[in-house]
């Protein structure tokens, strides 16, 4: 009886110490990131190149890029894509891109009016597709990579495609901190939009 009691006390002590060790390791907190402040417009049109009401569709993306978890790749060819468990965007990348497009295009006077909602009286529709929205780490150096397809259609229904382009930007983060990667994403996205606006000017 004494041996059994001693064994039970020893077991309880081991369990208690194990639990104490586990509880001493803090669980990482979730962190959320947004796009940075809008930059000063690099281009403002005297007259809108899109002569009418423009609707910005919700950007399309593969399933994994419609979620808020930040994606990353560390292999040399960037074939394998993973997701961070504790780092999230404030909104999914399609909504981040749509919001940034609306804000930047309005500041640039790119269209007579710009809307995100469905409306039968729009004259143009801007459709985008996110191909990459990833944090890429090469030799310990983190970069933000954004790859987007852009198509501008006439009419409310899918009419004629009057503009079509693809843009890819890679911006190195200032450090390996995730907050600096988020800032790099903001700069990369603004570079994509700047290129789109500069090409839009002479295409319509």
Question: What do the predicted segments below correspond to?
Answer:
Residues 71, 77-88, 156-191, 195:
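Short secondary-structure boundary motifs at beta->alpha junctions and helix caps
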Residues 24-43, 107-158, 173-175:
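Surface-exposed short loop/turn segments
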Residues 94, 98-102, 186-189, 193, ...:
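Extracytoplasmic/secreted envelope proteins and their assembly/folding machinery
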Residues 1-11:
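Bacterial N-terminal signal peptides that target proteins for export
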Residues 18-21:
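C-terminal motif of bacterial Sec signal peptides marking the signal peptidase cleavage site
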Residues 53-59, 71, 125-129, 145-151, ...:
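Soluble periplasmic/extracytoplasmic beta-strand elements of cell-envelope proteins
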